[in-house]
UniProtKB/Swiss-Prot annotation:
It catalyses: 1,2-dihydroxy-5-(methylsulfanyl)pent-1-en-3-one + O2 = 4-methylsulfanyl-2-oxobutanoate + formate + 2 H(+); 1,2-dihydroxy-5-(methylsulfanyl)pent-1-en-3-one + O2 = 3-(methylsulfanyl)propanoate + CO + formate + 2 H(+). The gene is adi1. Catalyzes 2 different reactions between oxygen and the acireductone 1,2-dihydroxy-3-keto-5-methylthiopentene (DHK-MTPene) depending upon the metal bound in the active site. Fe-containing acireductone dioxygenase (Fe-ARD) produces formate and 2-keto-4-methylthiobutyrate (KMTB), the alpha-ketoacid precursor of methionine in the methionine recycle pathway. Ni-containing acireductone dioxygenase (Ni-ARD) produces methylthiopropionate, carbon monoxide and formate, and does not lie on the methionine recycle pathway. Residues 1-22 are annotated as: Disordered. Residues 9-22 have a biased composition (Basic and acidic residues). It holds the Pfam family ARD. GO terms for cellular component: cytoplasm; nucleus. It comes from Emericella nidulans (strain FGSC A4 / ATCC 38163 / CBS 112.46 / NRRL 194 / M139) (Aspergillus nidulans). This is Acireductone dioxygenase. Its main location: cytoplasm. InterPro entries: ARD (IPR004313), ARD_euk (IPR027496), RmlC-like_jellyroll (IPR014710), RmlC_Cupin_sf (IPR011051).
Amino acid sequence: MKAYWYDNKPGDQREPHDSGRPVSEDYLASLGVIYRHFPELSDVDALAKERGYKNRDEITVSPATMGEAYEDKVKMFFAEHLHEDEEIRYIRDGEGYFDVRGKEDEWVRIRLVKDDLIILPAGIYHRFTTDNKNYIKAMRLFQEEPKWTPLNRAPELDENQHRKSYLEGLTATSIAAN
């Protein structure tokens, strides 16, 4: 895993867009983002049990598996959105980027590779893309039946209870740190 501030320069979303300014795991944790490196699937199983995750599936994002739909899917994943459930992804193969909004609404890019696991809290704005190799295989973990329901960023989402709870948690973390 490598995290850094996104450079916001125009260009292909699948390029690194590395500003040269690193972001620490502690900062990610302050956003509610949890990172782990799990070389063994048994570690993922233990985390799933601990967090009450009963279901999982695997998705391979590549032109070979998605055909003509690939470019549209990657664009859809890259649209800024949130979920009302936390999102857990375990990278089985390949590489990709999760971008999450920092405390000042700036993008933090998180590069994930094989055996990396990330947990994004409910209510955090984020987006995803493959890297320029156009291939990633990820396990998706779910507490209930597998579902992936993105809520694309819009002003009315400021009133979403999951978004409000997330922002309240950020405020509480900031106050506790001072």
